[in-house]
């Protein structure tokens, strides 16, 4: 059996009562105090996640911008230095290699933050598709990454840094920011639907920053609540809402797919065609009317006919209802449409509802 990978924070997990699981080959905390309590802490106060398992890939060189324009669906030329952008990397078929965030450090240097389980695959794909004068380096092992999320995130982080956090706009970042005596990159971003920051630091210093933030009375948060939080906010999870068989258009991520950008990009032709012909299926929100929780891969029916599949589902701690995301035949995606979800050997009534399920008050 292959030994599970561990983040630089791993030695501290036991001290804070973590219960760990195998997540894409990593030994990561699924929970600390409990999923519901952790979820509520992030929605009402603040919580701290160890996300050091995420991959970081450095792209450098005079042709970095044009290379990323070719590789990614969003418009890289629109990113200013000190800003980040959500992006999709596609295959020629329009299916998804990964979803990721691009940080622009300078005109010739970018960092791509990718999903942990996809890091090696993404890196190989990027190297295979290199164009022009660029270098591509997997620097994942050099970085620790923490996410401080919740309405009080700014107030808490301000105690540990001199950086004026209020001046960092959404998807903006600052480099060389001192946090608890450690040089970091602070980005105003996250995966919870709340305000918050993602903080990058050298791996060796990650534990120090982790404990300094927890010492401010912040709850440590595991993967269980990370999933319920992102699901309420309808943020895609690779392997569920996105895959090599699911295009970003089907997943409703049109805002990150710039079909009109001048640059040709991998998958552009297939995506243009899919848009012109019209989508056969699309991602919708569902809420169960009867008892039961929709889970990944459960079938969705209408009058005995299978019309789609659940990609993610949970009991929503914020709403108290059972919710899910499902890829459904476009003909049946009207809000209010009643459907049934196959849960074990039973068909359970559900309806299509508007998304996101949760949106924070500005």
Swiss-Prot record:
It comes from the Bacteria. Its EC number is 2.1.2.10. Gene3D superfamilies: Aminomethyltransferase beta-barrel domains (3.30.70.1400), Aminomethyltransferase fragment (4.10.1250.10), Probable tRNA modification gtpase trme, domain 1 (3.30.1360.120). Pfam families: GCV_T, GCV_T_C. Keywords: Aminotransferase, Transferase. The keyword Lyase does not apply. GO terms for molecular function: aminomethyltransferase activity; transaminase activity. The keyword Chaperone does not apply. One of its GO terms (biological process) is glycine decarboxylation via glycine cleavage system. Belongs to the GcvT family. The glycine cleavage system catalyzes the degradation of glycine. The glycine cleavage system is composed of four proteins: P, T, L and H. This is Aminomethyltransferase. It comes from Listeria monocytogenes serotype 4b (strain CLIP80459). The lineage of its organism: Bacteria, Bacillati, Bacillota, Bacilli, Bacillales. The gene is gcvT.
């Amino acid at each position: 059996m292959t030994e599970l990978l561990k983040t630089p924070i791993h030695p501290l997990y036991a001290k804070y009562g973590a219960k760990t699981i195998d997540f894409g080959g990593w030994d990561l905390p699924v929970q600390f105090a409990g999923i519901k309590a952790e979820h509520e802490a992030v929605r009402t106060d603040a919580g701290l996640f160890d996300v050091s398992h995420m991959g970081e890939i450095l792209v450098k060189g005079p042709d970095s911008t044009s290379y990323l324009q070719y590789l990614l669906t969003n418009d890289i030329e629109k990113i200013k230095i000190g800003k980040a952008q959500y992006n999709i990397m596609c295959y020629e078929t329009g299916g998804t290699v990964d979803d990721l965030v691009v940080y622009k450090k300078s005109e010739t240097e970018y960092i791509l933050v990718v999903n942990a389980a996809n890091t090696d695959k993404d890196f190989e794909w990027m190297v295979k598709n290199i164009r022009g004068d660029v270098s591509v380096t997997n620097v994942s092992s050099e970085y620790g990454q923490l996410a401080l999320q919740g309405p009080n995130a700014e107030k808490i982080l301000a105690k540990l840094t001199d950086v004026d956090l209020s001046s960092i706009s959404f998807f903006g970042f600052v480099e060389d920011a001192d946090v608890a005596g450690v040089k970091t990159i602070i980005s105003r971003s996250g995966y919870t639907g709340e305000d918050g920051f993602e903080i990058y630091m050298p791996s060796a210093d990650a534990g120090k920053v982790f404990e300094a933030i927890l010492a401010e009375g912040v709850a440590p948060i595991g993967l269980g609540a990370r999933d319920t939080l992102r699901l309420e906010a309808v943020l895609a999870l690779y392997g569920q809402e996105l895959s090599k068989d699911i295009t970003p258009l089907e997943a409703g991520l049109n805002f990150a797919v710039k079909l009109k950008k001048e640059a040709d990009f991998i998958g552009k032709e297939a995506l243009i065609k899919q848009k012109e012909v019209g989508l056969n299926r699309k991602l919708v929100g569902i809420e169960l009317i009867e008892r039961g929780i929709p889970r990944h891969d459960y079938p969705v029916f209408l009058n005995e006919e299978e019309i789609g599949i659940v990609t993610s589902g949970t009991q929503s701690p914020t709403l108290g209802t059972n919710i899910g995301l499902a890829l459904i035949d476009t003909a049946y995606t009207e809000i209010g449409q009643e459907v049934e979800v196959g849960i074990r050997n039973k068909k359970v009534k559900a309806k299509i509802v508007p998304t996101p399920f949760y949106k924070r008050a500005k």
